[in-house]
Regions:
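N-terminal soluble domains immediately following signal/targeting peptides that reside
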Residues: 1-135
Length: 135
């Protein structure tokens, strides 16, 4: 089966947009064109990804980064590495990947990703995950 993710709520942060990347394991793409930096918090509440309108950097020491399937095992001592020069970045976030539970009677599961800006404080992008068996 596959996990289908959807966004149910996006915070009202000027310049922020989020879309789900549909795939066998869903991902999320954020685009940010706001005036002040925006930080995505990781699964442990740590600073994970920083967005400005012209750059995206990731914290290679973040447990969320280390858990990504496509991250390199070799990291330098530098904590923040530039990943994009566009203000947009997509990744396979573990919060969008539920265990493949064939008992779908539980209904959709919820997910949330915290984002923070100096002006707005911490807010959440929230959504639902639904397991869909493939016949």
């Amino acid at each position: 089966g596959i996990v289908k993710a959807r966004i149910a709520h996006q915070p009202d942060i000027p310049g922020l947009s989020a879309i789900i990347l549909d795939a066998p394991r869903p991902g999320i793409l954020l685009r940010y064109q706001g005036e002040e930096p925006l930080t995505v918090l990781g699964t442990d509440g740590e600073a994970f990804i920083r967005f400005t309108r012209t750059e995206v950097t990731v914290n290679t020491e973040s447990p969320s980064w280390k858990a990504l399937p496509n991250q390199s095992a070799e990291t330098s001592q530098t904590s923040w590495v530039t990943m994009s020069q566009s203000g947009a970045f997509g990744w396979l976030d573990s919060r969008l990947n539920v265990l493949h539970d064939s008992n779908s009677a539980d209904g959709p599961k919820t997910w949330s990703i915290a984002v923070t800006t100096p002006k707005n404080g911490t807010e959440r992008i929230e959504g639902q995950l639904t397991y869909m068996p493939i016949h």
